[in-house]
Structures are given as structure tokens and as C-alpha cells.
Swiss-Prot record:
Cofactor binding note of this UniProt entry: Binds 1 Mg(2+) ion per subunit.
Recorded catalytic activity of this chain's protein: D-glyceraldehyde 3-phosphate + pyruvate + H(+) = 1-deoxy-D-xylulose 5-phosphate + CO2
Cofactor(s) for this UniProt protein: Mg(2+); thiamine diphosphate
GO terms for MF: 1-deoxy-D-xylulose-5-phosphate synthase activity; magnesium ion binding; thiamine pyrophosphate binding
Cross-referenced SUPFAM superfamilies: Thiamin diphosphate-binding fold (THDP-binding), TK C-terminal domain-like
InterPro entries assigned: Dxylulose-5-P_synthase, THDP-binding, Transketo_C/PFOR_II, Transketolase-like_Pyr-bd, Transketolase_C, Transketolase_CS
Metabolic or biological pathway: Metabolic intermediate biosynthesis; 1-deoxy-D-xylulose 5-phosphate biosynthesis; 1-deoxy-D-xylulose 5-phosphate from D-glyceraldehyde 3-phosphate and pyruvate: step 1/1
Domain of life: Bacteria
Protein name: 1-deoxy-D-xylulose-5-phosphate synthase 1
The EC number(s) this enzyme carries: 2.2.1.7
GO annotation terms (biological process): 1-deoxy-D-xylulose 5-phosphate biosynthetic process; glyceraldehyde-3-phosphate metabolic process; terpenoid biosynthetic process; thiamine biosynthetic process
Name of the coding gene: dxs1
Length: 649
């Protein structure tokens, strides 16, 4: 179907400047070819499909009407930008999307001058576009800044904070509200099309300004009545009153798949003398591809697929994902405790709470893209005696940090944080990596921070959280599947701040936090084979640190390796602080910390990302050998309580 279809018009387009040379009547054909190319490319690489197909015509129209890159297009999130990438000189690399050394799945300033602003997290576009618009105004330039934001992103307060400050930018700021949730049928009739084109035209806007001037000179009572009549009439016609209260001219709704509507409206908006302007564009996710239109949720993000049938490649069978283990254990806990409630921020499927909702619909709260609210809402529930589990991706928990400090930790409220997608995440790259939660959580007084080494440990930790009421507690776990351990049997309530010694050795000790335990054990096998007897501990808790176990290991080994799936400032800092405070390094103890590097790692397969960071068996062995070759000293054997024969430097 698509792979062999010809794309004669698209083949001629290397830049938007060439697109703008096309006859307007040929843009429909270009859009059809662009849709085929987008489907074909995502069929090869996988990625976000539905949202991109929904903005094909809008993307063509924006690059046709606006003088990009001089006029800045600022895309929100970036899931929908594959067609934009194809039209802006990157078609030859579009089948490298989300691959190692390939194109990003989001906009990146380093990738193209047409990517005016990087994106991946939601609801940032209007703020960034306002920055471009104000820079244009300060420079006495007429360059436009166009924010393209979806209706889902408008659930976040940041979008309204930006709009509330946007009036000063005037005509240079344009916001395109891409509404792909509304039914497209009602707003695309002849009357709606006429109204949208009329309202966006210069004569209408000038007439409205004149009438506002007249109203302002009326007696107070008449003026109020006139304004209310105007608001009522415009609200009935276009629904724009809310946005106008924020200082925007409102235009729409416009059929986002009808180029004959889109282009005249965008031209009128581009040439308007006043602003800022919001254009309400109605689109369908998956437009033009039957499988995606029929199952929008399943084609938002896809694996590689057969573009003819729409069938997606299935992942090979394996152990359950950490997310599903968390969800299933939480359901078990909630069946026993009706005080357990859950909160997520527009990610019920990603966090596994869609399953929880099937059992307890009244106890699952999806607050939209509102992490700040989610954290404080959870704090309120905890203060009222409930047991909230606040379930967020690590990368999005960053957005609620002040609330973590002010509303949870200071008040020592027993909010349970399930921090999903902790560590490196593969194809989504740096913007979605869960690199920093360890560092910013262990710094909070009262906070307990756990990380499981496998799926059974995660189930134990969820069970423990359900029974912990002394203050806030968190568990972080990665994207992907477990290691295949059994989940049968009763779950344990873990003693807070206690790790476990997995393997006894004499010379090297590996203190592992999280799912690097398997690699740590592989490294220990290799080190043992080289005559370097190695202990391995599953530390379980970054905070409170198991000081007794840590102290024993530091006193009895020559080389200490800490390993964690987080950035500088996390688990290793806890170990080093204790060692420094107690003088445990004064006699030449060698400690090496393995953690994520102090840079943003690009997209790749997870295992390669961790190997590049040195967080695999090879990296552990290399760190030990390097440490031993620097000022080595002999090792003597001592006896330690509960640990058997352990080596001491």
C-alpha cells in the first residue's frame, strides 16, 4: 500500500521555501503524500503515529502561510512533529526516528533550525512562543511566533499562566489550539466555516475594535449590557469568550483537515494588526489511516507495524513489566484496605492505574496534566486519613517538587509515591529519562526512598508502603520487564532502612540499589574468577541508608563500588557522606561510584544506554580493576558477626 506509492510532489520538497512555491490547489495532493510517508516511516521505526496524522493538513498550512524558520513554530510535546520533520529537510532520515544516532521523536533545536524550541513535556509551548514574540517586539521585528498546543495540554495550569501574560506580545503571538477530542461534525458546516473566516478577517476585527470604543463611551449600565450581549453572541457563535477574557482574539472552530478553510484563516491571522490571537482547529487523531481512526488509543504510540493491515509487532513473551507488577500488587492491597486511593496525572495506562480503575473506579483520580495539583491533592487525602498512592513518571514528578517539599515532606504526611520510568528509558531519550528523582528525593527530610532489585522486591515494597503511616515514602522502578523471579506466596513488610547481603566476599563489595543487582552479580562472578572475592548487597533503601550493613562492608573490604540508576547526588552521596562523617576512608579505603553521567544521554536501547554509562557488568569490573591498580595495599581476613569471613583492607 504505502511503501511503494509514488510521492511526486513531496519528492520536490526539501525545505518549506519550496513548499511555498507550490500552487495552492496542489497542497491537497501534498498532504496526502505526506500522510503516506508518515505512516510508512512509523511502520519501520515505531513511534507516535495518531497525533501526527491528525495534523498533516495543519502542518502543510502552517509552513505554507508562515515564513519559517523566520517565523517560529513552537510545537507542544512534539509527538505530532514527524510530518514537520519530513517537510523541513529531514525526510532522508525519517526512518531513523527514535533510533541510536537518529532523529529525535520530539523537536530539538540542535537538530534543525526549523525546530525553534525543544519539547517533550506538555504545556510549555505558549510560554516559549511568548518569549519569541516578545523578543520580536523588542527587536522591532514583525516575525511571528506560533504555538501549536493540543487540547490535552490545556489541562495544565502553565498554559493559562502564559496566556494570562500574553497580551503585551500583541499581533506577534498566535496560538493554535489543536482540538482532537471534539467531534468534528458540528463545527465544520458552512455557517461555522463562514464565521471563522469572517471573524479572522481584518474588516471584522477592525469593526469589533470600533464597537469596543463606542461601548467604552456609553453610560455604565448600557456599556455593561452591550458587553454581555457581545459576549453572549460570540459565545454562541464561536465559544471564544473564555479566551477573550485572557486577552486573546478567538478564531474558530476551523476544520483542521480542510485546507480551503485553514489557509485563508491562517493568512488573515498572520496579517492581523492586533493580537494575540487563538485559532481553534478541530482535528481527528489518526486521520486518513483507518486502523488509527478506529482505535485512537492503540495508535497513539505504536510498535513497528504492517502499514497495510495496521497490525503492530508484538513484543516477545517474557516476565511481567514492573508497571504491571506494581499495579497488580496495589490492587491486592486495595482489596484489603478501603483507605487506599490512587492519583495520576493524565497517565492511567502508562502507570498501570487503568487496571486499578477497573476494580475501584471511585478510588482512582486522574487529575490531568497537573503534577503540582496531584502531589498536593494527595497530601490533602493523607491529611484526611486516606492512603494515597501518587503514581507519576519520574520525569514528570519533577514538576511537582515544591509541593513535595512544602505540602508533603514538611508536614510529614504519609503520601506514597510510585515513581515509574526511573532511570534510562530508551527511545524517548533525555527528556523522558528518570535521572534525577533519587537525588531530589533523598535530600528531603522525612522521605523514605526505596528501589527494588526485581519484581518480587517491588511487590514487597508496595505491600510495605500500604502499611507505612509514619511519613512520606517512595518507590522507584524502571521501564521494562522484570527478571523472571516468582511472585507467588505472601509478600513481606520490609524493615525500613534495611538492605540484604546477597553474596559474601573478601576484597570487593558492590552496594547495588535498584535493578542493577543482576549486573552486579554477573560482575561478581567475573571478579571471583580473577581471584577478587566479591560481596554483593541489595541495599533496597537509598534513604534511610542501612548504616549497619554499609559500615560492615566499608570496614571489611578494600574496594567499594556503589551502583545506581540515577544522577549525581543520590544513593552514592548517602554512602560517601556516612563514610566521611565516620572517618571510614581515612585509612585508604577505595570507593568508586557508578551512576548516570553528568550529561543528557541521547535515545538508544536501554541496555546500550546503561552500558555507555558504565552501569553494566563490564563497567563494574573495569571500575574495580582501575581502583585496585592505584596505590594497592594488602588485605587481611577478619571475622564479622552475622557475615562470616570477610576481607579487610
Amino acid at each position: 500500500m504505502f511503501p511503494n506509492d509514488k510521492t511526486p510532489l513531496l519528492d520536490k520538497i526539501k525545505t518549506p521555501a519550496e513548499l511555498r512555491q507550490l500552487d495552492r490547489n496542489s497542497l491537497r495532493q501534498l498532504a496526502d503524500e505526506l500522510r503516506k510517508e508518515t505512516i510508512s516511516a512509523v511502520g519501520v521505526t515505531g513511534g507516535h503515529l495518531g497525533s501526527g496524522l491528525g495534523v498533516i493538513e495543519l502542518t502543510v498550512a502552517l509552513h505554507y502561510v508562515f515564513n519559517t524558520p523566520k517565523d517560529a513554530l513552537v510545537w507542544d510535546v512534539g509527538h505530532q512533529t514527524y510530518p514537520h520533520k519530513i517537510l523541513t529537510g529531514r525526510r532522508d532520515r525519517i526512518r531513523t526516528l527514535r533510533q541510536r544516532d537518529g532523529l529525535s521523536g520530539f523537536t530539538q533545536r540542535a537538530e534543525s533550525e526549523y525546530d525553534a524550541f525543544g519539547a517533550a513535556h506538555s504545556s510549555t509551548s505558549i510560554s516559549a512562543a511568548l518569549g519569541f514574540a516578545m523578543a520580536s517586539k523588542l527587536s522591532d521585528s514583525d516575525d511571528k511566533a506560533v504555538a501549536i498546543i493540543g487540547d490535552g495540554s490545556m489541562t495544565a495550569g502553565m498554559a493559562y499562566e502564559a496566556m494570562n501574560n500574553a497580551k503585551a506580545a500583541g499581533k506577534r503571538l498566535i496560538v493554535i489550539l489543536n482540538d482532537n477530542e471534539m467531534s468534528i461534525s458540528p463545527p465544520v458546516g458552512a455557517l461555522s466555516s463562514y464565521l471563522s473566516r469572517l471573524i479572522s478577517s481584518r474588516p471584522f476585527m477592525n469593526l469589533r475594535d470600533i464597537m469596543r470604543g463606542v461601548v467604552n463611551r456609553m453610560p455604565k449600565g448600557l456599556a455593561t449590557a452591550a458587553r454581555k450581549a457581545d459576549e453572549y453572541a460570540r459565545g454562541m457563535a464561536t465559544g471564544g469568550t473564555f479566551f477573550e477574557e485572557l486577552g486573546f482574539y478567538y478564531v474558530g472552530p476551523v476544520d483542521g483537515h480542510n485546507l480551503d478553510q485553514l489557509i485563508p484563516v491562517l493568512e488573515n491571522v498572520r496579517d492581523a494588526k492586533d493580537g494575540p490571537i487563538l485559532v481553534h482547529v478541530v482535528t481527528r487523531k489518526g486521520q486518513g489511516y483507518a486502523p488509527a481512526e478506529a482505535a485512537k488509543d492503540k495508535y497513539h504510540a505504536v510498535q513497528r507495524l504492517d502499514v497495510v493491515s495496521g497490525k503492530q509487532a508484538k513484543a516477545p513473551p517474557g516476565p511481567p513489566s514492573y508497571t504491571s507488577v506494581f499495579s497488580e500488587q496495589l490492587i491486592k492491597e486495595a482489596k484489603q484496605d478501603d483507605k487506599i486511593v490512587t492519583i495520576t496525572a493524565a497517565m492511567p495506562t502508562g502507570t498501570g492505574l487503568d487496571r486499578f480503575q477497573q476494580y475501584f473506579p471511585e478510588r482512582m483520580f486522574d487529575v490531568g496534566i497537573a503534577e503540582q495539583h496531584a502531589v498536593t491533592f494527595a497530601a490533602g487525602l493523607a491529611a484526611a486519613g486516606y492512603k494515597p498512592f501518587c503514581c507519576l513518571y519520574s520525569t514528570f514528578l519533577q514538576r511537582g517538587y515544591d509541593q513535595l517539599v512544602h505540602d508533603v515532606a514538611i508536614q510529614n504526611l504519609p503520601v506514597r509515591f510510585a515513581v515509574d520510568r526511573a532511570g534510562l528509558v530508551g527511545a524517548d531519550g533525555a527528556t523522558h529519562a528518570g535521572s534525577f528523582d533519587l537525588a531530589f528525593m533523598v535530600n528531603l527530610p522525612n522521605m523514605v526512598v526505596m528501589a527494588p532489585s526485581d519484581e518480587r522486591e517491588l511487590a514487597n515494597m508496595v505491600h510495605s508502603m500500604a502499611h507505612y503511616d509514619q511519613g512520606p515514602i517512595s518507590v522507584r522502578y524502571p521501564r521494562g520487564n522484570g527478571v523472571g523471579v516468582s511472585l507467588e506466596g505472601e509478600k513481606e513488610i520490609l524493615p525500613i532502612g534495611k538492605g540484604r547481603l546477597i553474596r559474601r566476599g573478601k576484597k570487593v563489595a558492590i552496594l547495588s540499589l535498584g535493578t542493577r543487582l543482576e549486573e552486579s552479580l554477573k560482575a561478581a562472578d567475573r571478579l571471583d574468577a580473577q581471584g577478587l572475592s566479591t560481596s554483593v548487597a541489595d541495599m533496597r533503601f537509598a534513604k534511610p541508608l542501612d548504616e549497619a550493613l554499609t559500615r560492615q562492608l566499608l570496614k571489611s573490604h578494600q574496594v567499594i563500588i556503589t551502583i545506581e540508576e540515577g544522577a549525581l547526588g543520590g544513593f552514592a552521596t548517602q554512602v560517601l557522606t556516612m563514610a566521611s562523617d565516620e572517618g571510614l576512608m581515612d585509612d585508604g579505603l577505595k570507593i568508586r561510584t557508578l551512576r548516570l553521567p553528568d550529561r543528557f544521554q541521547p535515545q538508544d536501547k536501554q541496555e546500550r544506554q546503561y552500558a555507555e554509562a558504565g552501569l553494566d557488568a563490564d563497567g563494574i569490573v573495569a571500575a574495580v580493576i582501575s581502583a585496585l591498580h592505584r596505590n594497592s595495599k594488602p588485605v587481611e581476613v577478619v571475622e564479622m558477626a552475622n557475615m562470616g569471613s570477610i576481607a579487610r583492607a
